[in-house]
C-alpha cells in the first residue's frame, strides 16, 4: 500500500513509496475517453449520460475528451488501488518536529520568507524508536552530547553545524510522515528559507528522499513540498477533526485542555532562557514535540488521516480539502463500476474560474454569552449526508432548478409543500443544465404545471428549488450509503472486540468507524 506519492512534471515520472516494495519510479500513460454519439464495442457509460471509447491521444481543446483533467496523484492512486478498501500501510516512519529561532520581528509571511534570525535548536521525536532528539547551538560548550533514557542531546558549535547534523539525522530517520504544530505556517517554511540562506538549495534538498524540495506561494501562504515526505500540521488537523471553535489554538493551551500537558513556564523571553539556562531551554524545546506526541496518543488524528486518505485514495497532504476527498472517493467508485467521469466545468470554460457566484449555506447565529432557560438543542445525525440521500443529489440526477428571484435568499423556499401554497398560475423561470457543455438554458412555466411535472416524474425538489430524478440512485447517495454501512460494520466489530477484551482490535475498529463518521 502506498505511503507517499509524488509526480515530477519535468520528467513525467511518478515516485511512489510502498510499504512492501519500497520506492517505485515509473512513467504512466493514462487512458482518456472520447465521447461518441452511440454505443460502440469497448464503450463505457458516462456518468452524465452517453458513451465514451478509450483512447491514448490527448487533446487539450477537445470538449468531448473525458478524464483528461484528473490530478496526476489522484489518477495514479485510482489506477493502482481502486480495488482495495479499508487497507492501510503496515508501517510508517513518523517524526514530530519543532524548531526554535532567535527572537526577532513578528512572524509575518514576509518575515518567514526572509528568515533573518538563526535557528537555535531543533527538537524531534522518532515515533518508531520513541527516541527524543534535541540539536542545539552551544557556542560556549556548556553541555556534553548525551544519549541515554531515549533522549539524545546533540550540542553544536554553530548554526551551520546544527543544520548539517540535523540533515544527517533526518536522512537517518527517513520519515514518511513529518508532523509539527503550526508547522505549515512557521516551522517548515522557516526551515526551508533559513537553510537555503545558510547552506544552499542542494543541502535543503536533503530533506527529501527524492532530493527535491519545492516552494510555492499560493493564496499568500507559505507552502513547502518535500517530495516523498508527507508533512502534516497537527493544528490544521485539530481544526479539521474538532469542529468546534477553540478559545485558543496555541499549542500549550490545546495540550493543557486535552492531555493536561502545557508548555514549560519561564521568566523573560526565549533569548534570555537560551542564554541563562540552556538545559531548561532544551526541556522547553522538547516539550513542544512531547505535547504533539501526547495529543496523538489520545486523539489519533494522524491515524485518522491515514485511514481517510486510503479510503478516498488521496495523498495525505490533501486531507484538509473536502473537495479533494470527495473527488478521490468518487473517482474510485466510478472506476470500480466502469463509469466514465465527466470533466470539470472549468476544463471546458476556464472563465468559470473567475466566476464568483455566491449562494446561501447554513445560517449560523452568533452565540450570545449568558444564562438561558428552556433551551432545546437539536443535533441531527449526519444532516448533510442525509439531505444528499433523501433528495438523491447528484450531477447525473439533476433535472434543473427554479431560478432565484429578487427576494432575499432565506425568504425563498421552493419545496413542494411551499409551491402548493402559491398561485398555480404564477410564472417561474426554470434553468436547465446542459451536462455536455455545462451551459444553462431557461424556460418559463406556471407553478401548477411545474407541480404536475414533479409529481408525475417523482422528482425531488430542495428548498432552493433544485430538482432531481429518483428513478436511479445517484453516485453520491450510493457512496454515502456504503460509508454508513461500513461504519455500522466496524461499530459492530468494535463492540464484539470490547466484549472479548481484545483491546488492540477494539482501538483499530474504533478508528475505522470514526473515519467513516468523519467522511
Spans of model-derived segments:
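Short glycine-rich phosphate-binding loop at a beta-alpha junction
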Residues: 175-183, 308
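Extended, Lys/Arg-enriched charged tracts that mediate electrostatic binding to polyanionic substrates
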Residues: 86-105, 203, 207-218, 224, ...
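Active-site-proximal helix-loop-helix substrate-binding element of RNase H-like nuclease domains
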Residues: 131-135, 141-157, 174, 178, ...
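Non-catalytic nucleic-acid-binding interfaces of large nucleic-acid enzymes and RNP effectors
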Residues: 1-74, 197-225, 264-265, 270-271, ...
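Helical catalytic core of nucleic-acid polymerases
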Residues: 380-519
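Conserved RNase H-like, two-metal-ion catalytic cores of nucleic-acid enzymes
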Residues: 3-42, 74, 79-177
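Short secondary-structure boundary/capping segments
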Residues: 111-113, 189-202, 310-313, 390-397
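Common nucleic-acid-contacting/processivity interface regions adjacent to the catalytic cores
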Residues: 15, 24, 271-392, 396-402, ...
Amino acid at each position: 500500500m502506498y505511503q507517499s506519492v509524488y509526480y515530477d512534471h519535468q520528467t513525467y515520472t511518478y515516485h511512489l513509496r510502498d510499504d512492501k516494495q519500497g520506492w517505485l519510479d515509473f512513467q504512466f500513460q493514462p487512458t482518456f475517453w472520447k465521447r461518441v454519439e452511440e454505443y460502440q464495442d469497448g464503450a463505457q457509460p458516462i456518468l452524465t449520460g452517453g458513451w465514451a471509447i478509450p483512447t491514448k491521444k490527448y487533446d487539450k481543446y477537445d470538449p468531448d475528451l473525458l478524464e483528461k483533467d484528473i490530478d496526476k496523484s489522484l489518477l495514479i492512486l485510482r489506477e493502482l488501488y481502486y480495488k482495495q478498501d479499508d487497507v492501510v500501510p503496515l508501517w510508517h516512519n513518523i517524526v514530530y518536529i519543532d524548531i526554535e529561532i532567535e527572537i526577532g520581528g513578528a512572524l509575518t509571511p514576509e518575515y518567514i520568507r526572509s528568515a533573518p534570525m538563526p535557528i537555535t535548536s531543533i527538537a524531534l521525536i522518532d515515533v518508531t524508536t520513541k527516541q527524543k532528539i534535541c540539536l542545539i547551538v552551544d557556542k560556549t560548550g556548556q553541555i556534553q552530547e548525551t544519549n541515554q533514557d531515549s533522549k539524545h542531546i546533540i550540542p553544536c558549535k554553530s548554526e551551520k553545524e546544527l543544520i548539517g547534523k540535523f540533515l544527517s539525522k533526518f536522512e537517518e530517520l527517513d520519515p514518511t510522515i513529518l508532523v509539527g504544530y503550526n508547522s505549515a505556517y512557521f516551522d517548515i517554511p522557516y526551515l526551508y528559507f533559513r537553510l537555503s540562506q545558510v547552506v544552499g538549495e542542494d543541502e535543503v534538498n536533503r530533506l527529501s528522499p527524492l532530493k527535491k524540495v519545492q516552494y510555492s506561494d499560493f493564496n499568500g501562504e507559505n507552502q513547502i513540498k518535500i517530495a516523498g515526505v508527507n508533512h502534516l500540521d497537527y493544528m490544521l488537523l485539530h481544526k479539521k477533526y474538532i469542529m468546534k471553535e477553540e478559545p485558543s489554538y496555541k499549542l500549550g493551551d490545546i495540550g493543557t485542555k486535552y492531555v493536561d500537558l502545557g508548555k514549560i513556564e519561564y521568566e523573560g523571553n526565549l533569548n534570555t532562557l537560551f542564554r541563562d539556562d540552556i538545559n531548561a531551554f532544551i526541556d522547553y524545546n522538547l516539550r513542544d514535540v512531547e505535547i504533539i506526541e501526547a495529543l496523538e496518543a489520545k486523539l489519533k488524528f494522524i491515524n485518522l488521516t491515514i485511514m481517510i486518505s486510503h479510503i478516498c485514495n488521496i495523498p495525505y497532504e490533501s486531507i484538509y480539502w473536502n473537495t479533494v476527498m470527495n473527488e478521490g472517493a468518487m473517482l474510485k467508485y466510478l472506476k470500480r463500476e466502469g463509469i466514465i467521469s465527466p470533466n470539470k466545468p472549468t476544463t471546458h470554460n476556464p472563465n468559470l474560474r473567475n466566476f464568483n457566484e455566491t449562494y446561501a449555506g447554513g445560517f449560523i447565529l452568533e452565540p450570545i454569552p449568558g444564562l438561558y432557560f428552556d433551551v432545546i438543542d437539536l443535533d441531527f445525525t449526519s444532516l448533510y449526508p442525509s439531505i444528499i440521500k433523501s433528495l438523491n443529489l447528484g450531477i447525473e440526477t439533476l433535472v434543473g432548478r427554479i431560478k432565484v428571484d429578487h427576494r432575499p435568499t432565506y425568504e425563498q423556499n421552493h419545496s413542494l409543500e411551499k409551491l402548493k401554497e402559491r398561485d398555480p398560475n404564477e410564472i417561474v423561470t426554470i434553468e436547465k443544465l446542459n451536462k455536455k457543455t455545462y451551459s444553462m438554458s431557461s424556460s418559463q412555466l406556471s407553478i401548477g404545471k411545474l407541480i404536475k411535472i414533479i409529481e408525475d416524474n417523482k422528482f425531488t425538489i430542495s428548498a432552493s428549488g433544485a430538482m432531481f430524478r429518483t428513478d436511479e440512485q445517484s453516485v453520491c447517495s450510493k457512496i454515502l450509503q456504503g460509508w454508513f454501512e461500513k461504519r455500522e460494520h466496524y461499530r459492530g466489530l468494535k463492540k464484539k472486540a470490547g466484549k472479548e477484551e481484545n483491546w488492540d482490535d477494539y482501538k483499530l475498529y474504533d478508528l475505522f468507524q470514526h473515519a467513516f463518521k468523519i467522511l
